[in-house]
Swiss-Prot record:
Task performed by this protein: Heme-dependent dioxygenase that catalyzes the oxidative cleavage of the L-tryptophan (L-Trp) pyrrole ring and converts L-tryptophan to N-formyl-L-kynurenine. Catalyzes the oxidative cleavage of the indole moiety.
InterPro entries per UniProt: Trp/Indoleamine_2_3_dOase-like, Trp_2_3_dOase
PANTHER family in alphabetical order: TRYPTOPHAN 2,3-DIOXYGENASE (PTHR10138:SF0)
Primary enzyme class: oxidoreductase
Reactions performed catalytically: L-tryptophan + O2 = N-formyl-L-kynurenine
Cofactor: heme
UniProt similarity note: Belongs to the tryptophan 2,3-dioxygenase family.
Keywords of the record: Dioxygenase, Heme, Iron, Metal-binding, Oxidoreductase, Tryptophan catabolism
Gene expressing this chain: v
Oligomeric form and interacting partners: Homotetramer. Dimer of dimers.
Protein name: Tryptophan 2,3-dioxygenase
Species whose genome carries this gene: Drosophila persimilis (Fruit fly)
GO BP of this protein: L-tryptophan catabolic process to acetyl-CoA; L-tryptophan catabolic process to kynurenine; ommochrome biosynthetic process; protein homotetramerization
UniProt keyword Lyase, yes or no: no
The protein's Enzyme Commission number: 1.13.11.11
Length: 380
């Protein structure tokens, strides 16, 4: 069957009219397939002991790296668009579109793991000796993705050495790592964007003050309900639960407590950015906050899918080499990979925890006419 985009879609029409009379590259030349399809060098074959599944191993990891390259391409373009004082609705729509593309790519990468799992541990052992000292830990592009997303160096789990040391004397790789560490990450740019959320201004709608008042009223109403509980033990339990909730809310209303949690690594956003994220979450049904809410949701999807990919990778490694063997690059293998599943690698952790601070819909402060008019004319 011929490509429908190459002619008029008629498989039997040998006189297809070309789209252009200009001389161009044919399919294989344009995609440089001669280089791409000749890049699978099986070391077992060179050793005259060819192992069939080594070919699958190479192809799968090369496919990962190609998709990593596309993710970096999308992240860089998104960071460029976010790096502005004002982001109009058109740009927000484009950012949402490209983040969604990254989400779909990551879903594809997660689904690639079962293909590798068609290889048995014994099959893998047949060629594993050829891999050392190579290791997935040495994937430069995955490290760049982490840094561009916002994984902090101090949050990383160390294994024997700093993560960038595995690139040794590769100055080009080290330069790329350094640049990715010092350039504004997606986390930093999203934080700046959230800090500008309209409605946070103390001289205007002052959402944060209204939210605190709503929380106080909500908790006071809960106390009244608890006090009517006839069973003393149940009443005390309810009152204790309300006090715990009050402490949780206090952690976002007191800037000093919030800052302490940031320094401890339990929160990522600045206090102002967290306020913006909560406001967007509450008013996501408002037209002006619809796209920003989609953007925040997609950031959580990206974090979730990377975690899911890490988890699938961990399970596959345990299945292939067990829990005690070292990785081919000298890491602790399964133990190291399992440690990367913690929240310290979750960049947009604060977005996942927003549900902790929700209040009933009827308690959410209503938008007044002034802020509604402002939202009509102001980009977020």
């Amino acid at each position: 069957m011929s490509c429908p985009y190459a002619g008029n879609g008629n498989d039997h029409d040998d006189a297809a009219v070309p789209l252009s009379t200009e001389v161009g590259k044919i399919y294989g030349e344009y995609l440089m397939l001669d280089k791409l399809l000749d890049a699978q060098c099986m070391l077992s074959t060179e050793d005259k002991r060819p192992v069939h599944d080594e070919h699958l191993f190479i192809i799968t990891h090369q496919a990962y790296e190609l998709w990593f390259k596309q993710i970096i391409f999308e992240f860089d373009s998104i960071r460029d668009m976010l790096d502005a004082e004002v982001i109009d609705e058109t740009k927000t729509l484009e950012i949402v579109k490209r983040l969604n593309r990254v989400v779909l790519i990551l879903k594809l990468l997660v689904d690639q793991v079962p293909i590798l799992e068609t290889m048995t541990p014994l099959d893998f052992m047949d060629f594993r000796k050829y891999l050392a000292p190579a290791s997935g830990f040495q994937s430069l592009q995955f490290r760049l993705i982490e840094n561009k997303l916002g994984v902090l160096t101090e949050q990383r789990v160390r294994y024997n050495q700093k993560y960038s040391d595995v690139f040794g004397g590769d100055e080009q790789a080290l330069s790329a790592i350094r640049s990715s560490e010092y350039e504004p990450s997606l986390l930093e740019l999203v934080q700046r964007w959230l800090e500008r959320t309209p409605g946070l201004e103390e001289s205007g709608f002052n959402f944060w003050k209204k939210f605190q008042q709503s929380v106080d009223q909500f908790l006071a109403a809960q106390v009244e309900i608890a006090m009517e509980e006839p069973v003393e033990q149940a009443k005390n339990y309810r009152l204790m639960d309300i006090e715990k909730r009050r402490e949780v809310y206090h952690s976002i209303f007191d800037p000093a407590v919030h800052e302490a949690l940031v320094k401890r690594g339990d929160r990522r956003f600045s206090h102002r950015a967290l306020q913006g994220a909560i406001m967007i979450t509450f008013y996501r049904d408002e037209p002006r906050f619809s796209q920003p809410h989609q953007l925040l949701t997609l950031l959580m999807d990206i974090d979730s899918l990377i975690t899911k990919w890490r988890y699938n990778h961990v399970i596959m490694v345990q299945r292939m080499i067990g829990s005690q063997q070292l990785g081919t690059g000298g890491s602790s293998g399964y133990q190291y990979l399992r440690s990367t599943l913690s929240d310290r690698y979750k960049v947009f952790l604060d977005l996942f925890n927003l549900s902790t601070f929700l209040i009933p819909r009827e308690a959410i402060p209503p938008l007044d006419e002034t802020i509604r008019k402002k939202l009509v004319h102001k980009s977020v």
